[in-house]
Structure formats: structure tokens, C-alpha cells
């Protein structure tokens, strides 16, 4: 087995391998950090590389913390029955991974989101690492594998659900029977998709 295969096998079931102990120590530190943190190197090198990361200029790795569970809505100031406040049971129609990608994109408006992957979770939070690319960097523009991201069509791609997590959340992984209301979009089908 090559190095990447060993890493992949260890991350398949983190609690059973050495990764579990590492995550425990790491999360103690991560909880105290800001929501969006730029990191030097990917935590899961095998996953990052399979999703398009390269150790060259123009690529940035960002770790994002997202609160687990349903959406926490702001409390109304006006008077009404507590049952009519609309604070609970309104879940976002987005995955936590997609939300994490959007948080990263807002923090670094000059970069584009390429992809992301899970790196840990506890009872309250989930952590994702987001691979971001600088579309204006000469190294990126001259690399035929990633130069497409510099095109106008890919500007703000994460906010339009064009990343892998976004497409999955929109139901675009499915086709055929049961996926009639998925295309062309959720909005075009008046929200019947979800």
C-alpha cells in the first residue's frame, strides 16, 4: 500500500485508528480558534489531493467551524405567541458543508472555492477544510488543469451551488425516476424538489 492509501484507510473509521486520538487533541485547540482559519497544510492530504489540491502557489486551505443541528434563527422583538415565533424547526435547505464553503468564500472574497471535505466533529460543531484557489494568480492561470476557474462563469460559484457539496444538496447527483423536479433547478420547479 502507498502512503495515501494508509491515510485513507485510517480516516475511514477515525475512532478505531490513531486518527481518533489526534482529533481529540486537535479539537480542544480548534474550539478556541475563530470560525474561519487559514491553515498551512491540509489535515487529510489524500482527500485534498483527490479533490484537486496541489502544493503550489495560488492554492489556499481554510478550516471552517459550523454549528451542528437546525438553523438558529434570530428572536423576534415584537409580541406574539411563542408558538408563532418561527424560531425552531426551520432547517436550512443546505448541507452544513455547503454553509462552511460559503463562510470561507465570504472571508476570502478574492478566492474561489474549489472543493471541501470533513475533518472532524463533536457534539456542537463540525469542521470542514475548504480548498480555495486564487483565480488571478499567474501560476493558476498557466496551469491547464485549473485555469478554467479564472473564467467569468465561475465567479462566486459557491453561492450558486456549483461546488460538489452544492450540487449534492440541490439533488443533482440523482437522475431518472424520482429526480423529475431537480432540473433545471429547485426554483424553476417552485421548491418541489425539497
Curated annotation (Swiss-Prot):
GO cellular component labels: cytosolic large ribosomal subunit
Residue ranges, compositional bias (Basic residues): 167-176
InterPro entries: Rbsml_eL15_core_dom_sf, Ribosomal_eL15, Ribosomal_eL15_arc, Ribosomal_eL15_CS, Ribosomal_uL23/eL15/eS24_sf
Keyword entries, A-Z: Ribonucleoprotein, Ribosomal protein
Single annotated GO MF: RNA binding
Positions of region (Disordered): 162-194
Biological processes per GO annotation: cytoplasmic translation
UniProt cross-references to PANTHER family, sorted A to Z: LARGE RIBOSOMAL SUBUNIT PROTEIN EL15, RIBOSOMAL PROTEIN L15
Protein family membership: Belongs to the eukaryotic ribosomal protein eL15 family.
Name recorded for this polypeptide: Large ribosomal subunit protein eL15
Gene giving rise to this polypeptide: rpl15e
Amino acid at each position: 500500500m502507498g502512503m495515501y492509501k494508509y491515510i485513507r484507510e485510517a480516516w475511514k473509521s477515525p475512532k478505531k485508528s490513531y486518527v481518533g486520538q489526534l482529533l481529540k487533541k486537535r479539537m480542544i485547540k480548534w474550539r478556541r480558534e475563530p470560525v474561519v482559519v487559514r491553515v498551512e497544510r491540509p489535515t487529510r492530504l489524500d482527500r485534498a489531493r483527490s479533490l484537486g489540491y496541489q502544493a503550489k502557489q495560488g492554492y489556499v486551505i481554510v478550516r471552517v467551524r459550523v454549528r451542528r443541528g437546525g438553523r438558529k434563527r434570530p428572536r423576534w422583538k415584537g409580541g406574539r405567541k411563542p408558538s408563532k415565533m418561527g424560531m425552531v424547526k426551520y432547517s436550512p435547505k443546505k448541507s452544513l458543508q455547503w454553509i462552511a464553503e460559503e463562510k470561507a468564500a465570504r472571508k476570502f472574497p478574492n478566492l474561489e472555492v474549489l472543493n471541501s471535505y470533513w475533518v472532524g466533529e463533536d457534539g456542537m460543531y463540525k469542521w470542514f477544510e475548504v480548498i480555495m484557489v486564487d483565480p488571478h494568480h499567474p501560476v493558476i492561470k498557466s496551469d491547464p488543469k485549473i485555469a478554467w476557474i479564472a473564467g467569468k462563469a465561475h465567479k462566486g460559484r459557491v453561492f450558486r451551488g456549483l461546488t460538489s457539496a452544492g450540487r449534492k444538496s440541490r439533488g443533482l447527483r440523482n437522475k431518472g425516476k424520482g429526480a423529475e423536479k431537480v432540473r433545471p433547478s429547485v426554483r424553476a420547479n417552485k421548491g418541489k424538489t425539497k
